[in-house]
């Protein structure tokens, strides 16, 4: 497929952006380092701010390495943000809260952070998982020792609670899985109580779990999709039933369901495995990028094998659509030799949201011939006009390719690179990394932060794979970035919250900000460092509705 590759007050300190004149790079009040990601030429991103860097300590609680899956919500006027850390079970990450009273120590865990939404100041940190209700040992050999938590998700309340019937629970959960061993364990942590439950229905699927994502829909049925990067290399659909009684995980329908494999069919014939060159087709048929799917029972033997299915997400306003990306491998070796690869973005569209067992259709929206390399993490969000977009993050591994963040517009079928790993640290093709950093880095964890930091804000993290002393293990950083264009608006939409139009409220905001900018201001539209007549001219040029 040929495609066109095309919070306001929180950025309180400014550094010159290396590429795009309008981009501001900010060291947040709690971070010891400038942002690990920067814009590319022509980026729609206005501001990037670092929130926490590995090694930073808040009230004695330290940010440890290999941050991966994330989610957040508001508690009062503060943001509660949660991160899972992708440590091996043997990692000396210290004795965690959920290991209190046992002989276990270290491994993967879940950290929580309280953050000011207006300044990005981190107020405190804590272990979010405080006890376990697991029933089998993982690769760490203990009930309370976890290995390689990867992508994660904090589902919307309606995913686990039906307000109409009262079934389910309004407790917030963090769901993630072990991307290690067969089977890895799928873990749902009750963020209200700190109890981590094992979703045993996923055990028979023998997954190395990248993520488990619950559908955001009012229903008595709990639907969740698990992606297995390794092990079965398949995509599984969990179907459970919400209850009126039991512990919070039981009420949520997380412990009584069944997992089914996605079985892709083309022309009514089962597709056993995705192909690097031909996708859902074969050498005899040539490339095929769409088909149908059914749900197959039978544990690890059920369904189509994909090329390392990674992260996935539901369309927030369309519970029939689920998007997932597969990683596969790079289009070149580390030495630069060309090789076939098939990193793709797929959409599953269920025929009946009230009966997911009825199957649906599958389509490769990005078919492996695009600029995306080893797509790993993603988020799906809706624009101000109701369109659907996908942010995709790359994990090129130990390769000179700089890990990128890309934005895909489903309606226009356009793909744009917006961020890259800082080449001054991590290097790039033809450019060596700067010690202690290396070319082995991964962008991860991205989510739409409109409900916490405001419309136009997104949060991501960086895994920087160079060794640090225990308990840090490896480097990394938590960061946020701001772009009204990604929400379908434009830079002249400066009044907060952005609304997709340029009108008197934006002029009023610009006049309030008029003069020299002492920090990032959305009103400094042209990035000159001063809110002046040039910015006013841009607002007048964009007067009316603006579309990003």
Map each language-model feature to its residues.
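Cellulosome-associated attachment modules in secreted, modular CAZymes
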Residues: 487-548
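Sequence/structural signature of beta-propeller domains
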Residues: 22-487
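Intrinsically disordered/low-complexity terminal segments and short unstructured peptides
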Residues: 1-6, 226, 240, 515
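Gram-negative bacterial Sec-dependent N-terminal signal peptides
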Residues: 2-21
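Generic hydrophobic alpha-helical membrane-segment signal
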Residues: 6, 204, 299, 433, ...
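A generic structural micro-environment signature
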Residues: 6-12, 57, 354, 424, ...
